[in-house]
């Protein structure tokens, strides 16, 4: 364990001895460095939970890594895995002509959605339409836009000015 890692939502001065060091996973279980097992019911917040140690996924990832592990898709580049994932998402969506913006996390997705919504209004000439509605107790990530969008007040505190133009409604108000 290291003090070099800043854990989200943890007190900065939290002692290293208070952390549970997860060292491996199998199926729906993860194990700490003492051998104790835990049900991984979080899906880890940062990725889609598909269970740990699945050999078919490990083999597919290893095969892809042998060809090319990754490459950016900034204009003018693309790559076959990114194209394939985008097509799979559009095929499963209700929008046959849909387009996909690939990101790395839910936090990044929230920030990008805010940007796209505001850009759409700018392009329509409706520059005054900048308000984003958030719900009380809604969690939308740790990035700047997601922190601004979330309805958990303590998570928005201590950062200075956040992204403006959010209004909050009760979580159960349709």
What are these regions (language model features)?
Residues 38, 44-45, 49-76, 84-104:
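Glycine-rich phosphate-binding segment of PLP-dependent enzymes
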Residues 87-174:
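PLP-dependent aspartate aminotransferase-fold enzymes
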Residues 42-43, 132:
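Short clusters of small/polar residues that mark proteolytic maturation junctions
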Residues 1-29, 43, 67:
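Active-site-adjacent loop/helix segments that line or gate small-molecule/cofactor pockets in enzymes
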Residues 74-79, 170:
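Short acidic-aromatic active-site loops that bind/stabilize oxyanions
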Residues 32:
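Acidic surface patches and DE-rich sequence motifs
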